[in-house]
């Protein structure tokens, strides 16, 4: 068994066994798998598998289950698409100012990822917009109008070589 402490769970100790880790790894690879197929793969009864999955959801091990769209296909459908990786440095880095920018950034639907980073810029954003006019509108809304934004450096994707969502889990 692997004991994991996480302050996000109010310091409640959660214990994951080998079956829980296999279940999480399988769901990371394909969350659309049916409970029966998942149970068969893990050699569990369907009821036990469902109970474990619900527990992992309730404890916060699984944040959400989504369908990941092909950015290439969506780009073809729309005729274009712009992905920008943006470094943002703030003028003042007090906790309340960092939190204020973060709150505004995560409310933007164009922002797919928002990371506080160190050293270097204060934030890294991954932004997906349909075209350059939409990018300009986004930057004016989030970056230009914020007096605390000191520096912005944007990089535009010309090719996505890899995109993954799986987290490497320990083996029991």
Each model region followed by its residue ranges:
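A compositional/biophysical signature of low hydrophobicity enriched in polar/charged and small residues
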Residues: 1-172
């Amino acid at each position: 068994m692997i004991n994991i402490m996480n302050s996000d769970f109010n310091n409640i100790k959660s214990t994951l066994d080998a079956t829980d880790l296999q279940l999480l790894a399988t769901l990371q690879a394909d969350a659309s798998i049916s409970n029966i197929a998942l149970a068969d793969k893990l050699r569990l009864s369907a009821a036990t598998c469902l109970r474990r999955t619900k527990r992992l959801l309730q404890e916060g091990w699984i944040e959400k289950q989504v369908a990941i769209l092909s950015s290439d296909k969506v780009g073809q459908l729309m005729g274009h698409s712009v992905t920008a990786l943006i470094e943002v440095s703030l003028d003042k880095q007090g906790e309340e100012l960092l939190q204020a920018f973060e709150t505004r950034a995560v409310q933007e639907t164009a922002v797919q990822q928002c990371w506080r980073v160190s050293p270097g810029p204060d934030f890294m954003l991954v932004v997906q917009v349909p075209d350059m006019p939409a990018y300009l509108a986004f930057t004016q809304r989030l970056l230009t109008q914020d007096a605390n934004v000191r520096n912005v450096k944007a990089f535009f994707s010309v090719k996505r070589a890899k995109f993954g969502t799986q987290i490497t889990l320990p083996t029991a």
